[in-house]
């Protein structure tokens, strides 16, 4: 809600504009054409959805117009044992997790002062943020989309691409999917998955080449691809670096680390610059 995302009578709004009329409706990869969350879920699932009304089965959707309005349902959700099998929500919901529910001591976050950003978002907001970061000194490069969409970017070429950047460039490196390609080489519905899986492969190689660098992922589908490729089994949110920018600790079968995540369609133009300064300054 602090970022203008609210739900009223089941309708989701972005800064007062219905979701299907907002910037999300113009998203190249996943345009949203429905503002009613119940109908949006019904397009993908036959599971019944109830609004603000507790039921034994199905999906329970809560209206939320302010941070204060999150208090009551969040207390019920987090303090019930097995009533809720799966909880979904925005980053703001993390603030409502009761401290007593966390048994582990808070970790001391240690990240290097290098920041590598993987962006699979084609959103106008993200594009402006990448441009601002490049102007501020980031090394910003497109991945070779003409090869990516044809499945022709080999592991060897990917490693060569990564190693082509100097040590200085890798101190603040942004790799994005904004490069040009022939539209006839790929179906639009396959583009999102292709980008996310490619970014996942990049993340895997970057972890080997730059194991200590802080890694930031932009775009929900991109994050999914990274999680899949790194074989991440658990992700525990640690803190919000900025509103909606979450630092999470992850573990997989043989290592652990941190990921910074951000959805594509929000934040001011200087957001990446502020994140980089935080990384430079330490936690």
Located regions from the model:
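Active-site histidine-anchored catalytic micro-motif
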Residues: 1-20, 25-35, 212-213, 217-269
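Cap/lid and interdomain-hinge subdomains that line or gate substrate/regulatory clefts
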Residues: 1-73, 79, 282-283
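Short acidic, glycine/serine/threonine-rich loops at helix termini
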Residues: 5-14, 72-76, 98-102, 129-130, ...
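Accessory terminal and edge-of-domain segments that mediate assembly/interaction
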Residues: 28, 35, 46, 50, ...
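General beta-strand structural signal in soluble alpha/beta enzymes
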Residues: 48-53, 61-64, 85-90, 95-96, ...
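Residue-level preference for the first positions of well-ordered beta-strands
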Residues: 58-61, 84-86, 114-116, 170-174, ...
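Catalytic cores of soluble, metal-dependent hydrolases
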Residues: 95, 156, 162-163, 167, ...
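Redox- and metal-dependent alpha/beta enzyme cores, enriched for Fe-S-associated oxidoreductases
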Residues: 108-195
């Amino acid at each position: 809600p602090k970022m203008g995302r609210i739900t009223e009578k089941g309708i989701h709004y972005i800064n007062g504009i219905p979701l299907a009329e907002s910037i999300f409706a113009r998203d190249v990869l996943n345009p949203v054409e429905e503002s009613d969350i119940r109908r949006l879920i019904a397009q993908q699932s036959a599971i019944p959805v109830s609004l603000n009304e507790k039921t034994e089965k199905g999906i329970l959707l809560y209206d939320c117009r302010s941070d204060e309005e999150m208090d009551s349902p969040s207390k019920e959700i987090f303090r019930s044992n097995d009533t809720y099998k799966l909880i979904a929500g925005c980053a703001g919901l993390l603030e409502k997790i009761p401290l007593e529910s966390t048994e582990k001591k808070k970790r001391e976050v240690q990240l290097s002062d290098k920041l590598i950003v993987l962006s699979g978002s084609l959103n106008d907001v993200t594009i402006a943020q990448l441009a601002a970061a490049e102007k501020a000194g980031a090394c910003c490069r497109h991945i070779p989309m003409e090869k990516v969409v044809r499945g022709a970017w080999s592991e060897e070429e990917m490693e060569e691409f990564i190693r082509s950047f100097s040590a200085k460039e890798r101190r603040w490196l942004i790799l994005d999917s904004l490069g040009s390609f022939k539209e006839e080489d790929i179906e639009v519905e396959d583009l999102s998955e292709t980008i996310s899986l490619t970014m996942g492969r990049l993340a895997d190689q970057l972890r080997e080449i730059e194991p200590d660098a802080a890694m930031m992922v932009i775009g929900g589908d991109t994050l999914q691809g990274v999680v899949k490729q790194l074989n991440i089994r658990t992700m525990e949110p640690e803190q919000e670096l900025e509103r909606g920018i979450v630092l999470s600790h992850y573990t997989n079968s043989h290592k652990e680390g941190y990921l910074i995540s951000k959805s594509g369609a929000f934040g001011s133009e200087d957001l990446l610059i502020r994140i980089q300064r935080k990384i430079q300054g330490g936690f």
